[in-house]
Structures are given as structure tokens and as C-alpha cells.
Amino acid sequence: MKKFFVFLSSSLLILTSCVQSRELENLGLTTAVGYDLAQDDLISSTIVLENFNPQIENSSRTVTAQSHTSKGMRQKLNLETSKNIVSGQLRVAIYNEELSSKGIYNLVDTLSRDPSIGNMIYLCVTDNTAKEILNKKDPTNANSNIGTFLYNLIEQNYKGDFIPSPTLHNFLTRLWEVGRDPQLPVLSITDDFVGITSMGLFENDKLVYLLPMDKIFYLNVLSEDMKSGNTEIGLPKGDLEKHFVKPAESMERTQEGNIIFITLSHIQANKDIKLKESEELTFMISLKLKVRIVELSKSLELGDPKTIEELTKVLNKKFKENLENTLYEIKETKSDPVGFGEVYRVMKDSKLTQEKWRELYPSSKFEVKVDTTIVQTGVID
């Protein structure tokens, strides 16, 4: 009798696994979705489908349809595939720059209302079309799904403190906070490869500016809790020149210009933003940085405490200059990704509205103080 029950149980397990396998083979698992602006106020939607078929190495494909609404597109997309499209594996949503500039709230809200989609999926913008991005292949693995590649691309840059958080949850939280705006990474195709090239700044749900790559660090250090950031910074030789290592003539590397470049890693940032007590709308930004020196374009006597002291002063001055330039550049766009309005609301006006902050923000000023500590130089004592 026991043998019969063992045989029956085994048979049921095999049958169940076969049924589950057949069910999966009938599904089109959406790993990425992209939205572009089409003619006649239509929206073009492209999805990447992963077809569950262990016998086919590269079983992903893209499907495109146009409609006025996200759900309308879903219906049309289902008409173009033999698989039942499901969103439970969605990892990335991409919005074309032109579409984003007109507002993407309705499209983002639809994702948040779908119970099968988690709120930790990544959102991003592209200055190409979303369709172009999603029709690219993973350059590291021809059989990989492009949706998975894009997810990993964004994930490692976010976790590496290169870009601010681009999750669906974070976008909606910032969208509804008074005195703070969303920001999303921008994907571009360069030399046939997809990569992050800038940061898209929003005013409410509308894209207003693409912040250049060299400014993203300064935005990130103020808008996120940086634990292990990286950056390359150019410093004027000036007072550092007397601390240069004097190599043998045959080893001397000629370097043009008056700039020395330093790569810093494992950057930890501790920031404090306060509203200055005066009639002027001035924010006091205090930033403490701990950095490690990884590489220099010109060798310095880093074993000498006087060199470290001088280098720290120069770093403080340059960080302050770059931060202030970035903040005023961002302010010109009318976007507030750092959240100065939130600081104002907490410290000055608890009844602040988004409309009122839009009136106040353009007149705001910034005073930055930076205190850098070099915790490691790479020098072996």
C-alpha cells in the first residue's frame, strides 16, 4: 500500500510539473516596456517578451503597438503574439524624451496600479526612441534578454552610487512630495551600445533638462545618502606643483595644461541643508566627505602630511565651486531634485504648496561649505 501511495505521489508531481511547464510556455513574460510619442496624439508602446522555452537559446522578441492608453496598447499587443502577455517579470520602463517633456504621470500611475508589478522596477528616459533601445542586443551576451541587460545596467550604477535611485516608488514619492522633484537616468545609443549618458530632471511629471554626466556626482551627493561614490575631479596645479614627485628624466611624463586629475573612490558623504535665517531665500549646505585617492595624472608626495593638507584645501575649494555651479545650473531649469522646497517647508512654512514653491524657488541662493577628509592615499607606509 505504501508503495502505491509513493508511486501515486510521484506521478502527481510529474504531472503537475508538466502542467506548470506547459502553462509557462504559453506566457509572454514582459521584462521591459518602452513608450514613444506617435502621430495624432497616440502613444507607441514596445515590450520585450521572454518566451519560456528551454529548447530555444534566444527566445525573446519585441512587439510594438499604438493606442491612446496603456491598457489599449496591452490589448493590441496581445493580438500580435500567440503568448498571453503578463507583467509579473517587468523590470524596466523607458520613456522617450519628447513624450517625457509632455508629462508621464498617467503612464507611470498605470504601472503603480498593476498588482503584478512591483514598485521597485526601474524607470528611465531615452533621447533615442524607446523602440530603438529595446531592439538592441545585450553586447555581453547575444542570447540575453535586453530587458535583463538594462535592469542590470541601471542596478549596478545605482548600487554603486553613480546615479540616484530610479525606482517607481521613488519617482512617485518625489512627485507627490511638496518641494521636491523626480529625476531619472537617461539612456543613449553611442557607437551602437546602450549606456547611461545623463540625468533627466523633472518639474512635476514633465522632463525639463538633461543634466550632463560630469554633474551627476554633485547632484547625487546632495540628493542621496552616498556610501561608496566615485568621481574624477580636475584640480588647478597652483599650490600643488611644489608637492609633485620629481621622477628621473627618462621617466618624466609630459603633461600639458594647468590641471591635475584625481580619481576618488569609496566616497562617503554626510550632508546638512539648512535655511539661513534672513529675508533672503538662502540655503546653507554643509558637506562632509571621506574619500580615497585611487589615481592621479601627476604624482604627488602623498606620504608628506603637508601635501595632504594642501591637497585637502584644494579639494574643498574645487568641490565647493563645482557644487555651487551645479546647483545654480539646476535652479535655472526650475526643477528641484535636491529637495530645497522640502527644507523650506519643514523650517519655515508647514503649509507650503507646490505652486507657492514654484514661485519662490527661482530666487533661492546657495552657500556651500565642504570639509574633505582623505582617509587613504594608496601610499604604502
Ranges and model annotations:
Residues 3-6, 13-381:
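Membrane-proximal alpha-helical signals and transmembrane carboxylates
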